[in-house]
Amino acid sequence: MSNLEVRPAPSLCGGTGRTGPVRDVQPGKQVPLGESTVVRRLLPNLGRRMVGAWCFVDHYGPDDIVDEPGMQVPPHPHLGLQTVSWLREGEVLHRDSLGSLQTVRPRELGLMTSGRAIAHSEESPHGHGPFLHGAQLWVALPGAHRDTAPSFEHHTDLPVINGGGLSATVILGELAGATSPGTTYSPLVGADLTLTAGTDTRLPLDPDFEYAALTISGESEVDGVRLAPGTLLYLGCGRGELPLRADADSSLLLLGGEPFEEQIVMWWNFIGRSQQDIEDARTDWTTGSRFGTVHGYDGDRLAAPELPPVALKPRGRVR
């Protein structure tokens, strides 16, 4: 998925700074995605740019797309990151410049590693179902791996942890001894948590990780905080477990990882280490080099926005 903001602001994030356990509720914002989809952007937000290596989170739906085209994101580039496609309802057709062609369905992991450069498109396939509901997330690649070869993975058999009214699907990384088959380049976790009505349980966590949670359906209570869709709850580090409650059926995404100590520059769909990295990537996309071609998409590719006239300034992990 692309960041389709007309004037995406460059930002430098990461760097040192650990916190103990906190409960910081941070609102997201509504962002149009293509012609027919509006997403809730929860990361980066007004208070925080990263949670571990997680640096971008869009939650969309559930949307009724019976008489709509659904998701239509033309070919666009990525650099220095991984994209994680996660669906609750519907399906998304992924194409990329490696030649991958894959339909991603609910509770299947679509994991694309851009490494040094890749381009892809995402669209609701012809004859798509009535609803679309899911999340698109990005993971920043550490400096040692940012020039790795691009790849795409599709995993349909993900580990699930069940108990106490909680069902946790490990999307990426490791949680409570269960490990996703998706490739990772830094210690992290992404999990889909389903809570049945009456759930009152505690989920084991890694105290070295920082965590955040966001509700994707219903309303639940996370460490005593009532959490509805549209907000992100930053939980900090130093937690050995996480209290979870639900009066009605609900679901959450849990994101975590070791605090990302490197400083990164993120603009549009690129992650680099300097403004020059970003400028070079934009030039290469505009001139048709480095990122390759997405074959089979019926339409034009996305044009890169204009770079802002300001120099990048260090901002740290929080704004």
Describe the predicted segments one by one.
Residues M1-R319:
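Jelly-roll (double-stranded beta-helix
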